[in-house]
UniProtKB/Swiss-Prot annotation:
Protein topology in the membrane: Multi-pass membrane protein
One cellular-component annotation, GO: plasma membrane
Protein name: Uncharacterized protein TC_0273
Biased composition (Basic and acidic residues): 323-342
Primary localisation category: membrane
Cell location: Cell membrane
Keyword Transmembrane helix belongs to the record: yes
InterPro entries linked: DUF5423 (IPR035355)
The keyword Cell cycle appears for this protein: no
Length: 367
C-alpha cells in the first residue's frame, strides 16, 4: 500500500513584539535612523571614556572599563562607514574619513590617558600607572593604523582612480564605436550573401553545369543500364552459339587450341633487325565463316546487327571498350608465352652438344 503524505505547511516563528525589538528594528523600517544610531554609539563611547577618567582621577582598577567603551566607539564608526557607503561617492567619502580619522582618534585617546597619568603623580610611579600603560598601547595602535590603513588606502585610491578613468574611457569609446561596427558588420554580411547568391544564380543559369544532387542518381542509372545491356548481349551471344553449333562440347574442346590459331607469333626476324615479338597474325583463311563467327562470339565480339537492335549507344561503347580490353589482355598473354618459348629454345640450344671445330672448318670451305 502506498502511503500518501499530507502536504507540510511551513511553520512561522512567532514575532516578538516589544519595545526592545521595535527599537532595534527601527533602522530597518526607516533607513535615515541608521546614521542617528551610529553617531549615538560614538557619542556614548566618548562620554564613557571621559567619565571614567574623571571619576577615577587616573588611578584604580576602574580605568580598565575604558576598553569596552573604545570597542563601542569602534563599532559605531564601522557602522557609520557602512551606512554611508551605499552609493559609490558616499563609499569613497566614508572610506577616506575612516582611514584618515582613525589614527588621529587613537592618538588623541593615548594622549589623554598619558596626561591623566602624569596629572595623578610624576616620577617613576608613572610607569606603574595603568593609564600610562594603556596610553602607550593606544599610541602603538595609532602608529600601526597610520601605516596599515591610511597609507595603504591613499596608495590604493590613486590606483583605483586610474582604473576608473581607463574604464570610463573604454566604455565611452566602445559606445561610440558600437554603431559604426554594427553598420560595417551588416554591410560585410550583406556583401557576402549577395556575392554567394550571384554565384549560385550563375551556376544555375549555366546549361553545362549539372546540379550536385543529380550527379549520383545519373551515374547509378548509367551503370545499371550498362549492366543490363551487357547481360542482354551475353544471353544473345549464347543463344546464337546454340543455334549455329548445337554440339557445343566439340567447340569447348577445341577452345584451348584457339590461342595458337588466333595469334601465332613470327619467330623469324625481319632483315632490318627489328624484333618481331610484337608482330602477330591471325590466320583465319582455313576456318569457315561459321567457325569465325563462333570464335568472334566466344571472344566477346557481337555482331553489329544484334547490338544495334538491343543496345543503346552507351552500351555499344561499353562493349567496344570491353572487347578492346580483352584483346589487349590476350596480346599481353601471347607476348609472355612467346618469351617463355624463346627462353626454352635458347636453353635447349645451350644444352645441346657443340659441333667439332673440324666440321666447322669443313663446312666453312667453299665448294
Amino acid at each position: 500500500m502506498v502511503k500518501i503524505m499530507a502536504p507540510i505547511t511551513p511553520t512561522t516563528s512567532p514575532q516578538v513584539k516589544g519595545l526592545l525589538s521595535r527599537f532595534l528594528t527601527a533602522p530597518d523600517r526607516h533607513p535615515k535612523l541608521r546614521y542617528v544610531y551610529d553617531i549615538s554609539l560614538i557619542a556614548i563611547s566618548i562620554l564613557c571614556i571621559v567619565s571614567i577618567i574623571l571619576w577615577t582621577q587616573g588611578s584604580g582598577l576602574a580605568l580598565f572599563a575604558i576598553a569596552p567603551a573604545l570597542a563601542i566607539g569602534a563599532l559605531g564608526v564601522t557602522l557609520l562607514v557602512s551606512d554611508l557607503a551605499e552609493s559609490p561617492k558616499s563609499k569613497e567619502v566614508a572610506d577616506t574619513v575612516a582611514a584618515v580619522s582613525l589614527p588621529f582618534i587613537l592618538t588623541g585617546t593615548a594622549a589623554g590617558l598619558m596626561f591623566s597619568a602624569i596629572a595623578v603623580g610624576g616620577g617613576a610611579v608613572i610607569l606603574a600607572n595603568p593609564l600610562f600603560l594603556m596610553g602607550s598601547m593606544t599610541l602603538g595602535f595609532a602608529l600601526m593604523s597610520l601605516h596599515k590603513v591610511t597609507y595603504q588606502y591613499l596608495s590604493n585610491r590613486s590606483q583605483w582612480q586610474k582604473q576608473n578613468k581607463i574604464k570610463q574611457i573604454e566604455s565611452a569609446a566602445w559606445e561610440n564605436k558600437l554603431p559604426k561596427e554594427s553598420k560595417e558588420s551588416s554591410l560585410q554580411t550583406s556583401v557576402r550573401y549577395s556575392s554567394l547568391a550571384r554565384k549560385d544564380k550563375t551556376r544555375r543559369n549555366k546549361p553545362g553545369m549539372p546540379n550536385k544532387g543529380s550527379q549520383v542518381p545519373a551515374s547509378i542509372a548509367n551503370t545499371e543500364r550498362s549492366l543490363r545491356s551487357e547481360e542482354v548481349l551475353h544471353s544473345q551471344s549464347l543463344l546464337r552459339q546454340k543455334e549455329l553449333f548445337p554440339n557445343t562440347s566439340n567447340i569447348k574442346k577445341e577452345l584451348p587450341n584457339t590461342k595458337s590459331i588466333l595469334h601465332t607469333p613470327l619467330n623469324r626476324r625481319s632483315p632490318s633487325g627489328s624484333d618481331s615479338d610484337d608482330v602477330y597474325y591471325t590466320p583465319r583463311a582455313g576456318l569457315s565463316s561459321a567457325e569465325t563467327s563462333a570464335l568472334g562470339d566466344i571472344s566477346g565480339i557481337s555482331s553489329s546487327s544484334t547490338s544495334s537492335k538491343t543496345s543503346t549507344p552507351k552500351a555499344k561503347r561499353r562493349v567496344v571498350r570491353s572487347s578492346r580490353s580483352e584483346r589487349n589482355a590476350r596480346h599481353h598473354r601471347n607476348k609472355e608465352d612467346h618469351r617463355q618459348n624463346q627462353e626454352e629454345s635458347s636453353d635447349d640450344e645451350d644444352s645441346s652438344p657443340l659441333p667439332s671445330p673440324r666440321r666447322k672448318k669443313y663446312r666453312s670451305r667453299p665448294k
